[in-house]
Amino acid sequence: MRLVGAIVIAVVIASCAQSPGPTPGPATNVPCGPSEVLTRHEHAHLTILIRGEIKTVPAFVGITATQICWLHTHDTSGIIHIEAGDDRTFTLADFFAVWRQALSQAAIDGDRVGTGESIQVTVNQQPYAGAPETIVLKEHQDIVLQLGPRFLTLQPYVWPAGY
């Protein structure tokens, strides 16, 4: 009887636990290891709007219980942490690969462009004419991806103290 009780308790605890965040993706350009590497420590910000609605960038993209990728998130603020061991170039495509989500001129994170729709991109409040996946991630960059119409004009991201 004690074994049955222990199993029931374990099942209840497991079902109430938070679900794990996304696991690191197969991005060949983004190393992952057992701890953070801070040779290069920068941050970019990503906002995603799908038909005028904000789509949250999840916490713990690129982080598992055993490893952390050089591109990752700690929370749902949209801040992408670039914590790397060298000065290699990382793109938004690299971050989306770690996240295991689609990014192109026809799709953002599983949402595809429909008839009469398009993807608009701004970097630091300036229109970006290239493919969104080619955006090079840089310190304090403010990246906005919008699939619409319903395109919104956003204020620049205000960085929290310490970033």
Regions found by a protein language model. Give the residues of each.
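Sec-dependent signal peptide recognition
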Residues: M1-I9
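C-terminal motif of bacterial Sec signal peptides marking the signal peptidase cleavage site
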Residues: V12-S15
